[in-house]
Amino acid sequence: MILALALGGMLSAQAQHVQESNFCSPFDFPILLSANFGELRPNHFHNGLDIKTQGVTGKPIHCIADGHVSRVAVLHGGYGQVIYVTHPNGLTSVYGHVISFAKNIQACVRQYQYAHETFVCDLKFQPGQFPVKKGDIIALSGNEGASAGPHLHLELRRTETGEYIDPMPY
């Protein structure tokens, strides 16, 4: 009970900051969740929202705010394919389990994979390389990595510290 009250107080303070940031939805259909922020998992707390994608892969994912693609990774487990967008308000949004990235980003990933003869990669980008605007399609939803069904794993983090923030309040 005390832990719940303490977590509730922390999330409330964070919610006020997030509401000021003017984010949009990552999808153009009504949001239904399969998992919430802070849910207890076998060995950790869930650090984001799992958004259902109507039981299918390939749904366009919209960038929730202006910023730049700062990182993409392709992994066998975990997020599978993941894209990180750094925003000027000091937050980074993370989109996990995607099936593919926007064409310009996907081309960069493929070029790296072929040049280095590896599927797995973790690429970091400079602010001017891949700028994005709120609403731009940055990826397609998937079921990649450690995923039990099609969905988008969406996280918000403080860019400087990596601290997780509940995306729900926006």
Q: What are these regions, as identified by a protein language model?
A:
Residues 96, 104-131:
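Aromatic/His-enriched, Gly/Pro-containing loop or helix-boundary segments
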Residues 152-161:
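A short hydrophobic beta-strand segment most commonly corresponding to one strand
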Residues 1-9:
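Bacterial N-terminal signal peptides
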Residues 13-82, 86-91, 101, 118-119, ...:
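Surface-exposed, glycine-biased beta-strand/turn segments
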